[in-house]
A protein has these predicted regions:
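Short intrinsically disordered terminal tails
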Residues: 1, 196-197
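Conserved non-catalytic scaffold segment of RNase H-like nuclease domains
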Residues: 1-107, 130-144, 148
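Acidic, Mg2+-coordinating catalytic module of metal-dependent nucleases/exonucleases
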Residues: 84-96, 129, 133-196
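P-loop/Walker A phosphate-binding loop and immediately adjacent motor/lid segment at beta-alpha junctions
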Residues: 105-109, 179-181
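Short alpha-helix plus adjacent loop in nuclease-associated cores
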Residues: 111-131
Length: 197
């Protein structure tokens, strides 16, 4: 088992893993090396206008791409080497992959940068009684991510790089929280991830 983690992202024809299909799958390691990146040709859908407006992946772009069945063993070879999976709304991507035959380790830990970022950004959602989940573009902008360095937003490889950047910032940037202990003001240095726990 490697003592590292992977960042994964997908682009899909819609939001329902049982009905919609993968259009792109990207996986990078914690150092930014590309482990897998491919467009995926759907086998049931021939158009996805609503999703295309968001991810800009047209039917023509995936027409000559492999199907998920043709690449799932390559994806599984990667997944079985990592016990930590990072993503932005990671369960969405993991569910789509699992529905298509992906085999994550039973012991895999999932780190969701979206859920970690929500209390840092601090926008409260009264209806849910919790912090509002923010878009990846919001989280990346908050930390000053330069999209031009890699792909654009809503391309799964570009989203992997942005997620890696945000996840790293959440876990390495520190803030000084001041507390009064025994009558003395003391500064405690914590990462945002430590503060949100």
């Amino acid at each position: 088992m490697e003592n590292k983690y992977i960042v994964l992202d997908t682009e899909t024809t819609g939001l329902n893993a049982a009905e919609d299909e993968l259009l792109q799958v990207s996986i990078i390691d914690n150092e930014g090396a590309v482990l897998f990146d491919s467009y995926i040709k759907p086998t049931q859908h021939t158009e996805w206008a609503e999703a295309e407006r968001i991810n800009h992946i047209s039917p023509e772009m995936v027409a000559d791409s492999p199907t998920i069945e043709e690449v799932i063993s390559e994806i599984n070879d990667i997944l079985k080497r990592y016990d930590k999976i990072v993503g932005y709304n990671v369960r969405f991507d993991a569910d789509f992959l699992k529905h298509n035959g992906a085999e994550f380790l039973n012991t895999a830990e999932y780190a969701d940068a979206m859920k970690m970022f929500a209390p840092i950004y601090g926008e409260w959602n009264d209806q849910r009684g919790s912090y509002k989940w923010q878009k990846l573009t919001t989280a990346a902008g908050y930390y000053g991510y330069d999209w031009s360095a890699h792909e654009e937003a809503h391309n799964s490889l570009g989203d992997c790089y942005a997620t890696l950047f945000v996840y790293d910032k959440i876990n390495t940037d520190t803030m000084v929280i001041e507390r009064v202990i025994d009558g003395k003001r003391v500064g405690i240095e914590l990462t945002p991830a430590e503060i949100s726990q």
